[in-house]
Regions:
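Extracellular beta-strand-rich, repetitive "passenger/adhesive" scaffolds
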Residues: 1-190, 196-269
């Protein structure tokens, strides 16, 4: 908002020196802006009741923390190598662009925090320490809000990635596109549209506990990889329309509901 800038770099040299840059509300009377074509290392946003908008790509080689206020990407890039954290009362709004991809190492939305995903693709390519001690690529705590913005959340790390959706909100499209290791879902995960599985052939989507459930309201696509290996889905699960190009679907001992099944080369066991 407005024309005031807390940092305006229009082509000068900015060296992060592996330090943290803090943007706070000291002296602010309204919202402000940030423009920096260079990379930050760590960034903290502490704006109280105010907001800030990026006027260039936000790139961090470390972490991005919003303790208070609202950060909006202004339809510019958002690429954070490590953990993004949103504290109680704080908000991150990624853009409504239908062509951009935003990249986060991992995301923790604490109770009272709000995250709005990108309308196109929000990619998670790392993992962080979850409340259960597992490497949570995405953790939405109880009391937090996750707004899918009708976009796709894509998980791509070569390591294990945990998904913990304990707050309000569900995925729209969820894509698991990994060359190695598993995806572990905690609690009960809902996908408003489509779930796409594209994992290494010997790796799997699995629950943290056999009682955890999945609800897909559109289509479950299995391009490669497995569902339900190592730990089975033994509760009542709804997979929508199942389309298998390859891969393996291992049915648990519970109830698996399908709207339709089209198996073009996979295995159901």
């Amino acid at each position: 908002g407005g024309t005031d800038f807390m940092l305006y770099n229009d082509g000068g040299t900015f060296t992060h020196n592996s330090g943290k840059v803090l943007f706070d509300d000291a002296g602010l009377s309204n919202g402000s802006n940030i423009r920096n074509p260079s990379s930050f290392h760590d960034v903290e946003i502490a704006l109280g009741s105010f907001s800030c908008t990026a006027h260039h790509n936000m790139t961090c080689t470390g972490t991005f923390l919003v303790t208070s206020g609202t950060y909006s990407d202004g339809s510019n890039g958002f690429h954070i190598d490590e953990l993004v954290t949103i504290k109680n009362g704080a908000t991150i709004n990624l853009s409504n662009s239908t062509t951009q991809t935003k990249k986060l190492g991992a995301l923790l939305v604490e109770s009272g925090g709000t995250f709005r995903a990108c309308r196109n693709i929000t990619e998670f390519d790392g993992s962080g320490a979850g409340h259960s001690g597992q490497p949570s690529a995405l953790e939405v705590e109880s009391g937090a809000t996750f707004n899918n913005n009708l976009g796709t959340c894509k998980f791509t790390s070569a390591g294990d990635q945990d998904i913990e959706m304990d707050g309000t909100g569900m995925f729209y499209n969820l894509e698991l596109a990994k060359t190695n290791n598993d995806v572990v879902m905690h609690a009960n995960v809902e996908v408003e549209n489509n779930l796409t599985i594209d994992l290494a052939a010997d790796h799997t989507l699995r629950p943290a506990s056999t009682s955890n459930t999945v609800t897909v309201r559109g289509t479950t696509f299995i391009k490669e990889g497995k569902i339900g290996d190592t730990t089975a889905y033994n509760g009542t699960n709804n997979w929508g329309n199942l389309v298998m190009k390859s891969g393996t679907f291992i049915l648990g001992s519970g109830t698996n509901n399908f709207e339709s099944i089209r198996n073009k080369g996979g295995t159901i066991s």
